[in-house]
Amino acid sequence: MVYRLIDELICYGIKNQLVDTVDEVYVKNRLLELFELDAYEKSDFDGEARPVNEILEDLMKVAHEKGIMEEDTITMKDLFDTKIMGMLTPLPSVVQRTFAEKYTESPKEATDYYYAFSQATNYIRKDRIAKDEKWVTDTEYGPIDITINLSKPEKDPRDIAKAGKAKASGYPSCLLCRENEGYAGHFNHPARQNHRIVPMTLGGEDYYLQYSPYVYYNEHCIIFNKEHIPMKINKATFEKLLEFVEKFPHYTAGSNADLPIVGGSILSHDHFQGGNYTFAMARAPYEKMFVMKEWPNVTAGIVKWPMSVIRLQGKDLAEIADAADHILKTWRGYTDKEAFIFSETDGTPHNTITPIARMRGDLLELDLVLRNNITTEEHPMGVYHPHSEYHHIKKENIGLIEVMGLAVLPARLKKEMADLETALLQGADIRGDEVLAKHADWAEKWMSENEVNSENIHGIVQAEIGKVFAKVLECAGVYKRTEEGMKAFDRFVEVIK
């Protein structure tokens, strides 16, 4: 059985250009060593390899039966199957050389190769990504994307216990650091033997390209600094983002903001995120144009979007970065008490920007999303953050991906929504249900507005979740979509013109 699986895995590796036929015997011997076998026996494998997750699942059963893999928990299996795939994955030098060769043909050819490679190695676990629920909801801002993220597996209690006992090594410093490439991992850190990164230069500094293993959208990539240095939004950030989309014109690239609440989950390591995807925000049109007198060649305007966005367009990277820097510096020091915008309180800064770059035809485009992280007693998690009436759907920070119009919602919603649908169809008392009670006000509202039945309830629930997400983005907008809010936005525009 095990010899057949080894043959099947090597066949998969050759077919997916991970293993060169020259290296076939070498890889086979490494796998024999891993499975504590001294000899090889020819199997009856017929040459048709299954998807890699199925082959690995069978190999792990063998490893568990033989006592090579102690327990069959999710974390243990992830550590072990990544170790297996690491034996098939080419050295970093090979991947970097191939990427560079493909790039000379075209940037798209290079990323096509690298994305296919990152899936073939099982670094991107396609079988898990396929579990994510995705749909599109029409809103006044156009169609927006909703996903319920199910690809991160729940931790097994045995794994949690082991992780609690494990010593913190501090190596690699975080999940983004380049030292992850080839790292074996442990109970508190994922294995990355099958992980390969691609070097590049942005703004004269060393960066690396990789894909997100969770792929929230097509070719979801991360561009991270060689050094473990904190996130910072400044003129250099704008220049680097614009330079990246010049190098990869089919990709978008943005950065999370550099302050808590409005920033992402990793503020400690300078990085951007991008990918080959047209976000709803990119489809949103200009709503109001204005001219910046020092940068007449840069097209500027407010975008029709639930958050407060200024879009800059032009052909000259330096001019756009200059204009963006002027807006950033002005915003960092800007206070408008009437609009409840305070640049700082007690010396703590509140204003920053979430920037997103893309090519639009032959024009460079930079969207600047105005952010503010002030908190109050009424809104302790943030005034410009999802408000409490929407926490039953989304209470987490609104980071870069959400800003662009893609909701990444917690896995708990899948079961909660299924249970809610069943309860409503049965006429059950959801207010008396410990888990579902939080959805009661929301559900009652749309139940009264629709003729709900078993055929349409799922579609209605999805559409209503989408509407909540649009409202959540409005919460995060510093200038509200009201007459008063737009007048306040105009006041800021007058200052930057």
What label would you give each PLM region?
Residues 1-223, 227-230, 304-306, 320-324, ...:
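Active-site microenvironments that recognize anionic phosphate/pyrophosphate groups
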Residues 194-196, 228-253:
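Helical scaffold of the NTase/Pol beta-like nucleotidyltransferase catalytic core
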Residues 236, 245-265, 274-335:
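Catalytic or ion-translocation cores adjacent to nucleophile or general acid/base/metal-coordination motifs
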Residues 260-268, 346-352:
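Beta-rich nucleic-acid/ligand-interaction surfaces
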